[in-house]
Amino acid sequence: CGKSSAEAGLQDKLTGALIGLARTCQTAVPTAQTYRVILEGLFTTVTNVNFNTETTQVMIDKVHAESASLSDSPADDYDMSGLWNADEDIRSLKSLILFGMRGMAAYAYHALMLGKSSDELGAFFIKGLSALSEDWGMDELLPIVMETGKVNLTCMALLDEANTSTYGTPVPTTVPLTIEKGPFIVVTGHDLKDMERLLQQTEGKGINVYTHGEMLPSH
């Protein structure tokens, strides 16, 4: 929401680099590291996740390095102006695919942090990113849009399995709204593993930890 124009431009470059990596994977064999790089890269471009241009540039370099590790002739980065300046119907369909994958990558990344991954998801990220670079019409793009929704359900099931197998099945819980005296940390997002680590690190130190937004289920 509040990123600078410089950061917005870099996030487009990062997305273009990810599309190039996906296209490289069409002729090379992706690895578990490839999957992780794709997740990290897409997650970086989710709204309000990153505002730091240096961090984004590091991620771009990481994507390029992964492409180079897979092939002596990796695919070129995709120029995102080709998507943003396309016919409005094509732009809308490709945007649905892109934004759907960005959200899905966040969930898949959290699942991966808890030791859960899916070959089906990895294959779709490559397929979906590659589709963004194709000069396709509505008939070719609509099935990819529908598949994005279907695979998203698979991703949500994977995250649910990762969370419940690690922390148990959620039950209705009373959440206190009291603001305690003393230093505090507010945590948002979906990363329960980060919350667990933070609670361990602050235990007995007089630091209060509060949840915000999507972190409510941690209770």
Model-derived segments and spans:
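Metallocofactor- and cofactor-centric catalytic cores in central/energy metabolism, strongly enriched
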Residues: 1-219
